[in-house]
C-alpha cells in the first residue's frame, strides 16, 4: 500500500491491498467490449463507494448534494452543486456528468479530481467558486455499474445513444429534465456541458463536431475551447482535430445532439474521452487543465490569483494503526512547524488511486485520518 502526499513524497506502509487488473484494449473506440463485464468489483468503484464519498464531499460548506431522480432499479442519481453562491443569477454555470458507460471508470476519476480541485482550500479554487456554479453528476448510470455492465443500464440499453427514443429511459429523462431546468428561462443558464467518457485509443481527447453537423461559428468556438484546455496539458491532451465527428450531418441520439438542436452555439457541449487502458492516470492534471480551460473560455481570469502552494516545513506520516486492520485503520499526519496544503491518498500497488483522504490545508500539529 502506498500513501501519497501532494508534496511529491511517497510513503510506503506495510499493509496489503489486492491488485486491480489492467483492462485489455481490443480496438480504438469509446468504452470496452460488452463481453468484458465485471460483476465482482463494479469496475473498481461502485455505488456504495459513491455514497461514502458523498459523506465526505457534503462536509464542505460549498457543496449542495441532492438526488435529481432515480434509475430503473430505483437508485438515486446524485448531483453535486459546487459554488460559494449557488443561487447567484450572474455566476457562470457548468454541467458535468460521468459514468453513463459504467466500464469507463477513468471518466469518474477525472471527474473526482475536478471535484477535489474545486473544493480545495486554495485561492484559485475560492475564486472559481465565487464566479461559477458547477453541477456534477459523478455516476449517471449506477445500475449498470452495480450490474457490471460495460455500457448498458438495467434494461440492457445504451443510454448514451437513447436521447431520441420515443420513450426515454429513466436516466436519460432525469438528465434531460435537469438540463431544461438549468437552461430555460433563467438569467445564467448552462454554458458548458461536458460528457465524460474513456476510450480504447488510450488517448485523452475531445470529440470535435464538424461544421457539417453544427456551424462554422461553433467549430471556431470548439477549437478555442479544446485548444485552451490542451494549453494546460500540452503533452497529455490531443489536438482538437484528433477525433472529428458529425462530418456528414447532425445525429439525433446523443446528449450533444440534444444540446445542439435546443441551444446550438449557446452551449459548448462536448464529450471528453480519457484513456481506457493500463496507462491511464494523471487524473488530477487532466482535471485541473479542464477546469482552467473552462474558466478561460467563460472569461474567468485566473492569471492574477495568488496560488502559491504552502508546503509544510517539516512533516511526518505515522504508521497506520491497527495493522493489520479490519474493517478500518487510522493514519496520523504530523506537520511539525507550520501548516500547509496536503493531499493524502491511498494508492494500490499498480499506482491507481483508490481513495482520497485529504486534499486541503491543515494546521500544524497531528491530524488523524480514518480509512475503511
State each model region's role:
Residues 72-76, 88-248, 252, 256-276:
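Active-site/substrate-binding loop(s) of hydrolase catalytic cores
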Residues 6-18:
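Bacterial N-terminal signal peptides
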Residues 306-321, 325-346, 356-359, 368-371:
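Glycine-centered coil/turn sites that cap beta-strands in beta-rich domains
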Residues 278-302:
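His/Asp/Glu-rich mid-to-C-terminal helical/loop segments that flank catalytic regions of hydrolases
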Residues 71, 348-349:
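Short, acidic, Ser/Thr-enriched surface-loop or helix-capping motifs
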Residues 70-72, 360-367:
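Short proline/glycine- and polar residue-rich coil/turn motifs
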Amino acid at each position: 500500500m502506498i500513501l501519497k502526499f501532494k508534496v511529491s513524497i511517497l510513503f510506503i506502509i506495510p499493509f496489503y491491498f489486492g491488485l486491480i487488473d489492467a483492462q485489455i484494449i481490443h480496438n480504438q473506440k469509446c468504452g470496452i467490449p460488452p463481453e468484458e463485464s465485471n460483476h465482482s468489483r463494479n469496475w473498481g468503484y461502485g455505488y456504495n463507494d459513491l455514497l461514502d464519498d458523498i459523506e465526505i464531499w457534503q462536509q464542505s460548506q460549498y457543496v449542495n448534494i441532492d438526488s435529481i431522480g432515480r434509475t430503473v432499479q430505483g437508485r438515486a442519481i446524485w448531483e453535486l452543486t459546487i459554488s460559494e453562491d449557488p443561487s447567484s443569477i450572474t455566476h457562470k454555470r457548468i454541467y458535468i456528468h460521468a459514468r453513463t458507460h459504467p466500464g469507463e471508470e477513468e471518466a469518474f476519476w477525472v471527474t473526482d479530481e475536478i471535484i477535489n480541485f474545486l473544493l480545495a482550500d486554495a485561492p484559485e479554487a475560492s475564486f472559481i467558486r465565487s464566479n461559477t456554479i458547477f453541477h456534477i453528476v459523478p455516476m449517471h448510470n449506477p445500475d449498470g455499474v452495480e450490474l457490471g455492465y460495460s455500457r448498458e443500464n438495467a434494461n440492457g440499453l445504451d443510454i448514451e445513444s437513447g436521447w431520441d427514443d420515443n420513450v426515454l429511459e429513466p436516466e436519460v429523462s432525469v438528465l434531460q429534465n435537469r438540463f431544461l431546468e438549468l437552461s430555460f428561462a433563467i438569467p445564467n443558464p448552462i454554458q458548458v456541458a461536458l460528457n465524460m467518457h474513456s476510450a480504447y485509443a488510450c488517448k485523452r481527447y475531445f470529440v470535435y463536431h464538424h461544421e457539417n453537423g453544427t456551424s462554422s461559428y461553433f467549430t471556431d468556438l470548439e477549437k478555442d475551447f479544446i485548444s485552451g484546455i490542451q494549453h494546460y496539458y500540452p503533452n497529455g491532451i490531443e489536438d482538437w482535430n484528433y477525433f472529428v465527428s458529425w462530418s456528414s450531418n447532425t445525429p439525433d441520439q446523443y446528449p450533444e445532439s440534444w444540446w445542439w438542436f435546443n441551444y446550438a452555439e449557446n452551449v459548448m457541449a462536448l464529450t471528453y474521452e480519457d484513456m481506457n487502458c493500463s496507462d491511464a492516470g494523471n487524473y488530477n492534471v487532466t482535471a485541473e487543465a479542464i477546469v482552467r480551460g473552462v474558466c478561460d473560455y467563460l472569461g474567468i481570469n485566473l492569471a492574477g490569483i495568488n496560488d502559491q502552494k504552502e508546503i509544510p516545513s517539516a512533516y511526518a506520516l505515522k504508521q497506520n494503526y491497527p495493522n493489520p486492520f479490519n474493517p478500518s485503520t487510522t493514519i496520523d499526519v504530523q506537520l511539525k512547524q507550520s501548516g500547509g496544503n496536503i493531499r493524502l491518498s491511498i494508492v494500490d500497488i499498480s499506482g491507481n488511486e483508490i481513495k482520497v483522504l485529504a486534499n486541503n490545508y491543515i494546521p500544524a500539529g497531528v491530524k488523524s485520518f480514518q480509512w475503511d
